[in-house]
Amino acid sequence: VNGFAEMTKHECLMTNEVRTVRCRGVRRGERLANWIGAWRKHRYAAFTLIELIVVIGIITILAGLVLSTAGYARKKGARARAETEIAAMSAALESYKADNATYVRNTDTDGLDAQTSGNPCAYGDASLYLYKQLSGDTNANFQPPAGAKSYFTFKPNMLGTSPTTTTDACGNTLTPTTVSYIRDPFGNIYGYSTIQETGTTTQGYNPTFDLWSTAGLTTPGQPTASDQNQWIKNW
């Protein structure tokens, strides 16, 4: 008609081009409105930069919350395990005393004072002696002498050993065949002291024995009251 091709209403509404066609039953304004709507739909089909930044920020916050919660759970679990181990070793020490009329004791345990020593690296000798006497493994080589009595069975993760020969943070040489000390759940050495057995009442805490974990803390020299409040201990 009049030299122009005609298009259907659907074709006219879908096109976004200017054509020299006659669109039967479709107004120009209707075509324009339909084209603008299609453009807006295409424009908002993807995330904007601001939206991406917001999403990344939310993910980062959630990841931080998960990590902090996991860290708290691990620390709480370690404290609970240390409390259980200290209670179990204390019971073993009572059994040892019943047989030997004294708690596990030597010059190393008599010389360690929980009041003045907050560095677990200083606990090694006393801790090793405690292991030898409670386990019966007096050579600390996993081969107790024949007839040796064991008062406590130490789990592998409680022992200062290593699958390969290495040096720990305290400078101790760890091997797979020898025990260097009793390890707490935080990776440090358990403290064990019998200093009040020497007759002093101004050092140490218990007249029997002191057994403790610094709960992951390392305090050079004398620990503060705040430090000791975080320890897991038998006093």
Question: What are these model-predicted stretches?
Answer:
Residues 1-47:
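N-terminal leader/signal peptides at the extreme start of proteins
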Residues 36-39, 71, 75:
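Sec-dependent, cleavable N-terminal signal peptides
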Residues 5, 14-15, 33, 50-53, ...:
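Compositionally biased amphipathic helical and low-complexity segments enriched in hydrophobic
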Residues 60, 76, 121:
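Charge-dense, low-complexity intrinsically disordered segments
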